[in-house]
């Protein structure tokens, strides 16, 4: 490959070479053609739907199935706005998506004199549904911004990231981009927090686990933890499949039922892992659960810890790593009450829905 590339080609080359991107979703056009120009040389597959909304949902689905960030390559203006719904969906469901969209040439940014597909401020348009959204007028900032995006995807709560790149910047010549290596680690709770949490778990007589989408990569750790404390596990919609439906402690997606909610509120300990406890999970008229006992909340997003409830202990950390550390720190229980409770809830759900 030549030492000099168009910026658009250099972006794809960097994503392929350093971040393992092998597929992108979008529709090529005159505005973003430089991003497509070098796809074949990088071995990256381009999948083009009929509409950018489809590209966004494909990228979102890609992240669900592969565990990798979905990448959208879009044109400015309507290309981006067509994809707003899947971007918002990925934001709501905490899934990684990189949106690279062309935008108005640098000399026309914010001028509003009518260039094709102009928006007053493209980056601002999507900022509220992205971890960050930037307009990139200096091509040399791109490696740092792409690294920053991957740090969001891998060490924070995953969320979409949008980079708006003016057409003239995409067309500039540059040397191949080199990866900017930065230290990024998922947060780990303090030893004192683990100690207090372990004390609460060891003292509990009927612990319950509510697991959300933050557990999607922590199924094995969740199972071991639940088995160690004999706790029934209620799954939110975003956590379906995290724990096998055949596991005796799996109560399934039954949080919508009033009886289950009342049992949870009466428990002496509820451990909430990686979930917002949102209206969509509860379907109870927008009311938060009124926990009668202690609450332990585990989430990679610190802001989530005090939303909808005030926990007795809040642990900021990755679900899998935190559950593993707790499993090693607690006393293993030998009762079967948790299995019986999970069975009771499963039977209640079947009776309410008429499921076989």
Q: Could you describe each region identified by the protein language model?
A:
Residues 28-31, 104-105, 165-171, 213-215, ...:
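Glycine-rich beta-alpha junction loops
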Residues 22-23, 64-101, 127-178, 200, ...:
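Structural signature of the thiamine diphosphate
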Residues 167-192, 337-338, 349, 353-354:
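Aromatic-enriched
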Residues 8-13, 18, 27-30, 35-40, ...:
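Active-site diphosphate/adenylate-binding microenvironment
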Residues 1-3, 140, 292, 296-356:
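Phosphate/pyrophosphate-binding active-site segments
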Residues 53-56, 80-81, 104-109, 170, ...:
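Short gly/pro/ser/thr-enriched loop/turn and capping motifs at secondary-structure boundaries
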